[in-house]
Amino acid sequence: MKGCHYHSHNHPTHQHQYLYKSPCFSPNFSFFNFLHKFKLPLKPRFSSSSSSSFNSIHLRQLIVPKFGENNKFVCNNNNNNNNNNNNSNSNCMIMMNLVVIDEYIVAFFVASLLGFFVLFSVFRGRKLKKDEDGGGVVLTEDVRSSDDGVSSGIDVIVVGAGVAGAALAHTLAKDGRRVHVIERDLTEPDRIVGELLQPGGYLKLIELGLEDCVGDIDAQRVVGYGLFKDGKNIRLSYPLEQFSTDVAGRSFHNGRFIQRMREKAASLPNVRLEQGTVTSLLEEKGVVKGVQYKNRNGEELKAYAPLTIVCDGCFSNLRRSLCSPKVEVPSHFVGLILENCQLPFSNHGHVILADPSPILFYQISSTEVRCLVDVPAGQKLPSIANGEMAKYLKSVVAPQVPPEIYESFVAAVDKCNIRTMPNRSMPATPQPTPGAILMGDAFNMRHPLTGGGMTVALSDIVILRDLLRPLKDLTNSKALCQYLESFYTLRKPVASTINTLAGALYKVFCASSDDAHKEMREACFDYLSLGGECSNGPVALLSGLNPRPLSLVAHFFAVAVYGVGRLLLPFPSPQRLWLGVRLLTGAAGIIFPIMKAEGFRQMFFPATVPAYYRSLQVR
């Protein structure tokens, strides 16, 4: 192998020693080219007379500590035993791999630096993508795919196609989900409730793109309420000034409304609407994988999807698998249809504070008025079959309705087209289950006096849609379940306000022999008669336009304080003072148990619940 020589020279002017490479080195050896080209000065470490000392011994001392004493280099003394020659040079033969290492050390450093930045950029990009896709919920790159062991190709199974189920199917399908809806009966429903949609619910309908479902079904605009008590009446209008002219409540035939939403959902190519009866949820290791159902031909089938949403209504047979239901039946509704009846206030719902409980009237078409007579739970429900119901309606209820409605009411009773249904109340008590979630009346119910059920259901759908929208994949059921716990917290302020108002108003509006309760009922009517914020505030709560818990509590106790003030003026007496105390304690006894069942913390301080912040990872 050809020897490589290091040469040292003294510059004649600067007396500095320069080091340059021997021709044996590669012309591309950048480090030495750099020195040779610019002749960078190196401080002399030995004189020319001692250049012979820069021999194999010194090279060994420089190389061995770094590379070890091995066969990678061979140093030979070329002095031929001639010690008198001071300019003799030591030729050090170095293996090519050592030369290559020295030659590319700078290039290696630059390449390593560039590689580090490339890897950092890739890692950061993946992390940002992961955050955008749901804070770790998305585990695969398949967009909206279903991984269930069966090639069903379905992302979401919706059990039930009522108001909640049909609206939910349409909403999720618009976001690209493949939805399989299983409904027990696809014929047009015929119900006596779910016929009044408050303005707040109509706004949610607009937000979901379903507002046209109230068109072409002869739906009637509702702009407020008329309240009647002991021959007196007041008109309460919705505070709609800040909204467009189209925003108002709507009243209609429930079945027509549901059929329109079913048709709209089924018109989407990624929605499969099937008639069948779901008998059970399919679970595997605590995770719901799908449902077992019977189709219209009686065949037992199974359907699989990463997420199953149960919306099978107030008579749900699946809710016990997903929550701890505490269903109460505070009363029954007796339903009638009055034909060609002119109500005292056009485009208003009508509430009569009758004895023993309220009576409702509202238009459901241009020629029909729905009448709902409440029969409290403590009273035996008269039988329709033996004529007791007709007798009760004529003798007890008819004398209390407004004169304008009396004849139409009696005529409707005579037709004997009377129907009843239980009014159910159930606070939301979810048991988060991987792979499944409850919605609608299967999940949460309140007394239908205020007509807030559809508003709550549609509001819940908007919240769930917003939570699911950023997620491309739903197959990690456990992670998804943990993430969707935020749904139960986010819905609380709106849902709990409407639920509490419904329960509290029903108890206040019912007649009672208790003097304190009578004063509370009278105070409520007179408080609403004051107008201004005393009427706008409660009506905004009732309409779902301002469902704020603090506003509800403020107005409820303002009514109680107003009632106490009336008792103490002009001159308080011990008897009236005691009655005022009972009125306040009675008011607290009405509202606090309802709020406790709903959950004080979630209702008033949702931001203190850890699950509340899980949604922020995606937002």
Regions found by a protein language model. Name each.
Residues 147-151, 264-401:
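Predominantly flavin-linked oxidoreductase catalytic cores and closely associated redox partners
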Residues 1-100, 129-139:
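Short, low-complexity, Lys/Arg-enriched N-terminal segments of secretory-pathway carbohydrate enzymes
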Residues 109-113, 117-126, 410, 466-619:
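C-terminal helical "tail/cap" subdomain of flavin- and related membrane-associated enzymes
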Residues 381-488:
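FAD/FMN-dependent oxidoreductases across multiple families
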Residues 119-153, 298, 441:
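A short, basic/flexible loop-to-alpha-helix module at the beginning of a structural domain
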